[in-house]
Amino acid sequence: MDLHLIGFLLWFFVVQVTTSSAHRNITTTIPALIVFGDSIMDTGNNNDIPTLLKSNFPPYGRDFPGAIPTGRFSDGKVPSDIIAESLGIAKTLPPYLGSNLKPHDLLKGVIFASGGSGYDPLTSTLLSVVSMSDQLKYFQEYLAKIKQHFGEEKVKFILEKSVFLVVSSSNDLAETYWVRSVEYDRNSYAEYLVELASEFIKELSELGAKNIGLFSGVPVGCLPAQRTLFGGFERKCYEKLNNMALHFNSKLSSSLDTLKKELPSRLIFIDVYDTLLDIIKNPTNYGFKVADKGCCGTGKIELMELCNKFTPFTCSDASTHVFFDSYHPSEKAYQIITHKLLAKYRKYLNT
């Protein structure tokens, strides 16, 4: 097993044991969770920027504490919240661009992810959202604020002890590829994304982040909207898109292996593809009734403004669906995915 992976996993799961202790007054080993990426992790950064890609209105958030639509692209919590809570850091994490963010809120981490973003800079331009490069600029601003309010030692502590997660590529693969298809075929575009993702990791490491988890692409061809657009009358998964995601994952994993030898950071490749695909292919095994349609509206195409409080046919119980809208999983699915990943890594460590 790679020494970087052993180090990351030992560090990660010692924290899991520590934070699951009954003695909640013990100082948490991980001070903060800091996340970059897209709508899978976004907790509301798009709310106050000029983009159509928003979810701060019902029925989004209907299963969130207080039934508040916060700008999370789901019925409830998203993985960044679930991971933060699992690590004993916080029950939810704020968006960095949130208007109510106070200096003390910065200490447990923030979310820089912006729904609609991607590794390809064209992706964020097309959707008018926060690009990955701008997310890094905001991160530098965040570090400056930590230094201003809490001192240089606190900055070093957060950089060395926090978890940094990067979750992107879905919008690139599902949307921007069609614009780029004049320049690239599917495989070469996936490889272009790997170059961009690798450069992002290098820059994040150069800024001092020591513990970085990089998520794989997901089976985007099985998203309800992609089934509707490309799956034919039976709305099957669009395998050409899934194969592009698999090629991206393979090349990204290899690139990360190379980066582990070059960078001082601990790096781990988190493969979520098979986990989500198994839930989609075998929904009843996980307590779901519907996997090919979202809960909102008909479940076939509704997303963002098309998924609103007036949208007819919205299901009464989102926990019966793998997806909440035509692109994003329900909170129940996110909970299952997150805990399956934790169990997977724990088992891997014990081999």
UniProtKB/Swiss-Prot annotation:
InterPro entries (alphabetical): GDSL, GDSL_lipolytic_enzyme, Lipase_GDSL_AS, SGNH_hydro_sf, SGNH_plant_lipase-like
| Signal peptide (UniProt feature, chain positions) | 1-22
| Top-level taxonomic group | Eukaryota
Any one cellular component term from GO for this entry?
extracellular region
Disulfide bonds listed in the record? none
Q: Which PROSITE patterns match?
A: LIPASE_GDSL_SER (PS01098)
- Annotated active site residues, numbered on this chain, are 39 (nucleophile), 325, 328
Specify whether Signal is a keyword of the entry: yes
Q: Does the keyword Signal apply?
A: yes
User: Can you say where in the cell this protein is located?
Assistant: Secreted
Q: Name one GO molecular function term.
A: lipase activity
Q: Pfam families, alphabetically?
A: Lipase_GDSL (PF00657)
Regarding protein family, the annotation reads: Belongs to the 'GDSL' lipolytic enzyme family.
Descriptive protein name: GDSL esterase/lipase At3g14820
